[in-house]
């Protein structure tokens, strides 16, 4: 009986470990899949540009939250690092959902309302800054670029921006 309890406890612990591990891989998975899409010449140019935005947004976010200097610091607190990784992955997940919601709303919108949908989504990324980065040339590089299908600000709190967009009554648009 005690042996069974130990095995059961071990199985539960292993399953929790694997869930935690996979939850911490959101950002890396977005970077990995985006890189594959960017380099896949069989994909449409728009699809590749969306992947490039995701890659750039996640690279920017990671550089601000978890620069290499922090990762290489032997004195870095494990709890602090884990909190930063958790934050990065929450932001990465929210960004991915945000882009999916944007694409869905654009597909559902009537032709005459597409400009409004784009404006709302763009403005939301601008209004919900995460870092208040002064390098506006960089963080706004996609924002007014007509060549990009995703024209969002890189300096964005994706969790708050997603919550804002979800609060809009889309039935009237």
Regions found by a protein language model. Give the residues of each.
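Bacterial Sec-dependent N-terminal signal peptides
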Residues: 1-27
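Short, aromatic- and cysteine-enriched interfacial helices/patches
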Residues: 17, 25, 57, 130, ...
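Immediate post-signal-peptide N-terminus of mature secreted/exported proteins
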Residues: 24-72
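Alpha-helix boundary/N-cap detector
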Residues: 25, 46, 115, 152-159
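Flexible helix-coil transition and linker loops at the boundaries of alpha-helical arrays
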Residues: 73-77
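Surface-exposed, polar helix/loop patches in the mature regions of secreted/periplasmic/lumenal proteins
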Residues: 78-149, 154
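Short, low-complexity, Pro/Ser/Thr/Gly-rich segments in the mature regions of secreted, periplasmic
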Residues: 154-173
